[in-house]
Amino acid sequence: MKIVLATEQDIAPVKDRYLVLELDTFRIKDNIVPSWCVIDAGDIPLSEMTELDHFKTQHENLIKNYKKGDLNFVEQMLEHLRGKFGGNIDSFYMELFARLQQPKSDPWDYIITKEA
């Protein structure tokens, strides 16, 4: 698995050859840039391949609800997604779970600010 920072437009060609899942979104200077994990199909167990589209949809819903601030949904979905995708993104799921244990910012901001 690789993690890359790229716009949706820039990552689109990679989606034809690899499984690409959105992770966090970063603010670097004045630019908002999402991060993506790129997983080779060979890194995913054959037993998961039949449900891969389902897991991908669940992950997309997790990210969508995280952005909206529906952290209860996120916490429940994390339980279902751990171990999926060959365990390749479990460290991301553990990081999200750790964030959920912290007080929620008001107003909610899912974007992580980084210095360039």
Model-identified regions with their sequence ranges:
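Cytosolic regulatory/linker segments at or just downstream of nucleotide-handling modules
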Residues: 1-64, 68-73, 80-81, 85-99, ...
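Alpha-helical linker/edge segments of TPR/alpha-solenoid repeat scaffolds
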Residues: 99-116
